[in-house]
From Swiss-Prot:
Subunit structure of this chain's protein: F-type ATPases have 2 components, F(1) - the catalytic core - and F(0) - the membrane proton channel. F(1) has five subunits: alpha(3), beta(3), gamma(1), delta(1), epsilon(1). F(0) has three main subunits: a(1), b(2) and c(10-14). The alpha and beta chains form an alternating ring which encloses part of the gamma chain. F(1) is attached to F(0) by a central stalk formed by the gamma and epsilon chains, while a peripheral stalk is formed by the delta and b chains.
Protein name as catalogued: ATP synthase subunit b 2
Keyword Transmembrane: yes
Membrane topology type: Single-pass membrane protein
Location of the protein in the cell: Cell inner membrane
Keywords: ATP synthesis, Cell inner membrane, Cell membrane, CF(0), Hydrogen ion transport, Ion transport, Membrane, Transmembrane, Transmembrane helix, Transport
Organism of provenance: Parvibaculum lavamentivorans (strain DS-1 / DSM 13023 / NCIMB 13966)
CDD domains recorded: ATP-synt_Fo_b
Coiled coil: none
Length: 187
């Protein structure tokens, strides 16, 4: 319906057949025409010469410059990496040296502390031993005094018992003779 309406619009002409002019296409495809080979070869040589000059004067130097810059940048990066490597190795060496010094210092401090504590412990031990020796000496004196007192009591008891026994057996006793006899036996 729309096609019929468009076809019937005023001012539009209907073309019913297609016409193709034959003269323009009669010779075939121009690059394959043998009569134009010479001019085509000339233009081909001129085009390649122009392209060669353009490439050799403009494009190839730019590419060479880019490659040279890239090579230089890579060399600079490698040099910088080598410098960083050396700096890193120096930093590691300094770190290891500082670590070794810190360990040595820590061991020195630990040894000094150990020695000081051992000295302090030894001093305290000697002081305690001296106090204990003093207490032992006092205890021995007290024991000796207690022993002497006990022996005096034993002597007095022994003299009294011996005197009583002699008095009961003999009827009469000499106190001084009994004391001498007890002293002789106790010593």
């Amino acid at each position: 319906m729309i096609a019929e309406a468009m076809a019937q619009e005023p001012g539009s002409e209907l073309i019913s057949e297609t016409q193709v002019p034959d003269a323009e296409h009669a010779g075939g495809f121009p690059p394959f025409d043998a009569a134009s080979f010479e001019s085509q070869l000339v233009w081909l040589v001129l085009s390649f010469a122009a392209l060669y000059l353009l490439m050799s004067r403009v494009a190839l130097p730019r590419i060479a410059n880019v490659l040279e810059e890239r090579r230089d940048r890579i060399a600079d990066d490698l040099d910088q990496a080598a410098q960083f490597q050396l700096q890193t190795e120096e930093a590691i060496g300094a770190y290891e040296k500082a670590l070794a010094e810190a360990r040595a210092k820590a061991q020195g401090i630990a040894q000094e502390t150990r020695d000081r504590l051992q000295e302090e412990t030894e001093r305290q031990r000697l002081a305690i031993e001296a106090r204990l020796a003093e207490k032992i000496s006092e205890a021995e004196k007290q024991i000796a005094a207690t022993k002497d007192a006990a022996l005096q009591n034993v002597r007095a008891v022994a003299v009294d018992v011996a005197d009583t026994i002699v008095a009961q057996l003999l009827g009469d006793s000499d106190r001084s003779a009994t004391e001498r006899a007890v002293d002789t036996e106790l010593s």
